[in-house]
Structures are given as structure tokens and as C-alpha cells.
Amino acid sequence: MERAFQNRCEPRAAKPFKILKKRSTTSVASYQVSPHTARIFKENERLIDEYKRKKA
């Protein structure tokens, strides 16, 4: 038998489109923010979590 049939591997050309995975979260830690802004971000995160718990 041919080698391609033994391995049962698809050649790379058979998949012309690359599947991109969507990032689930974005990172805020990549840049520095003022302490005031950091507090606002933290408070927003807390409120979003509280809202999600009430909706669930």
C-alpha cells in the first residue's frame, strides 16, 4: 500500500483555510494604568460577576 493510505493523514493542501481560535478574554496587564483606573476596572469586574450571578 502507499504510504499516505497507511498513515491516514490528510495532506496540508487539503485544508486551505486556517482556523483561528477566538480569545476568550483580553489581558489588561499588558500596559500600566493608574491606581484609580485599576480600581474602576476591578469594580466593573465585580459588578459584571454580580450581574451574571443574578441572571443565572
Swiss-Prot record:
Keyword hit for Repeat: no
Entries under Pfam families matching the protein: SpoIISB_antitox
GO molecular function, one term: toxin sequestering activity
UniProt note: phenotype after gene disruption: Decreases sporulation efficiency by 4 orders of magnitude. A double spoIISA-spoIISB disruption sporulates normally, suggesting its only role is to neutralize SpoIISA.
Transmembrane segments: none
Signal peptide: none
Induction context: Expressed during exponential growth and sporulation. A member of the spoIISA-spoIISB operon, it also has its own promoter.
Listed InterPro entries: Antitoxin_SpoIISB
GO annotation (BP), single: sporulation resulting in formation of a cellular spore
Domain of life according to the entry: Bacteria
UniProt keyword terms in alphabetical order: Sporulation, Toxin-antitoxin system
Subunit and interaction comment: The isolated protein is unfolded; X-ray data suggests the inactive complex forms a heterotetramer of SpoIISA(2)-SpoIISB(2), which inactivates the toxic activity of SpoIISA.
Function: Antitoxin component of a type II toxin-antitoxin (TA) system. Antitoxin that binds cognate toxin SpoIISA and neutralizes its toxic activity; unlike most antitoxins it does not seem to be highly labile upon expression in E.coli.
Family listed: Belongs to the SpoIISB antitoxin family.
Record's protein name: Stage II sporulation protein SB
Species whose genome carries this gene: Bacillus subtilis (strain 168)
This protein's encoding gene: spoIISB
